[in-house]
Amino acid sequence: MLLDYLCDRPDVDQERIACAGCSGGGAITNYLSALDDRIALAVPTSWIAESTLLTDDSGLHTESWFTGLCDPHGPGTDQLLACICPRPMLILGNQLDSEFPPESMHRCYRTISKLYGQLGSAGQVEYRNVPTRHGFWPEARSELYRFLNKHFEIDQDSNEEHVEPELEETLFCAPNGQVRNISGSQTVHTLNQIAMNELATDRLVLHRISPKRRAAAVQSRVIQRMSPDALKWNPKIHEAITLSERHKQLLVEYELGFNTVVDVIGDQVKGSRAVVFLSDSNSFSRECAARLAEFGLTVYLPTMRSTSHRKEILAGKTWLHRRRQLVMNCAMLAARITRQVCAVGWGWHASVAVQEAACMQSELYTKVAIVSNLDSIESLSDSVESMHSMQLIPGFLRTLDLALLPLGITSPELYIAGTQRHDSTPLDLAAMQSHYALLMHTRSTLNRPSPILVPHQGAEHLEMLGSWLSGDV
């Protein structure tokens, strides 16, 4: 739209329109210049890197991805930028940029330069690496002006006039920078605190009402929210289930560009017992899977590839939602081969994902094990940092009370264990037992067996868990 506007202005030379940008602006520069020939010159910075680096799980800002770029078999960054040929392009790098390492950028440039040469425009692409951190600093802008002078044949001094930075105080949008002093304003932290207080009040009410009314409340607050109807806003879930049924080699596509490889540990014997094992640590998953396989279990390990937390949030989802879908897809594949399917979630993210999957596929699992490092949702409110680390979007706590989530699981057997809190302090066993006392009572009200509660630490669970899953205890 902006480019259309510029081209409509009589005072703009349409033969000399350049596009330059940094970071997310660098991404837009890449895409706009590659796809629209009206851009005569491109100068992207702080976004050039190999596709494998852009699409790993390092937390890069991938909300501006080019469609298909995250597909390992799709077009790479070098192929995308080669579309700018034969127009001039200057690739600017920052030596101190940890998000887009110069090494990856230079490898990308070498491929682009080769492609430019094959297309007869070898002299039209340049690479400069300036000694600065992530950003479009004066050193980089000086290179930009030089490149513009060279190709647009303009005589412009590349030295910028000195600019006096504004004082921090003058940039505040409220007196003293205290936004919360504005009448009626709130922050994400205070909104989550309010949500926590509301949930705590609701729990007190649950203690006072009759078992029948409590069961009805649980049904409406947990099970209904976990129903497919609650997820109609995301049709990709239904598409993913359909796709998973088509894959014969245990390769599940969650959605275009996101591949999940399912590794199988143990012998796939028809009629055996399968365990879908999800952990917050991939290396720990393999260690546990190997140990559980010694109990005669077939362990399925879903491994995520090409992911980004920020992309998930900006797409209206959270990392937890996709992990839940991985468990569900993997369980459906396992059910086609084995007689019984169990699910294990080890760690906070994994345990929540497994519980959600068990609520939505209640007929599929014979046993569900939850080995979590949080005893209840209250501990999430201890710090703002923990909120961000858990990738919770604002309002998440209003829609899902994790303390009540196990109530929606209808599996005949449920195993719950606590390890330690998120801040690595020793687990408060009294608080944990009190928390699960309500859980056990309410499950019995719903005519579901009480869960096994195991307040042990770390690796001590493996022996007991393996015996329980294999049916020995």
Where do the protein language model's features map onto the residues?
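Short glycine-enriched nucleophile-adjacent loop
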Residues: G26-D37, A350-S362, V368
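A conserved short beta-strand
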Residues: R38-L53, E363-D375
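Catalytic-domain carbohydrate-binding cleft regions of carbohydrate-active enzymes
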Residues: A20-C22, T29-S33, A40, P44-T52, ...
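Short, basic, glycine/proline-bearing loop/turn elements
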Residues: G59-T67, F277, S386-Q391
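Gly/Ser-rich "nucleophile elbow"/oxyanion-hole loop immediately N-terminal to the catalytic nucleophile
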Residues: M1-C22, I39, E312-W348
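Alpha/beta-hydrolase-fold serine-hydrolase catalytic core, especially in secreted/extracellular enzymes
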Residues: C85, L92-V261, I265-R273, S281-T298, ...
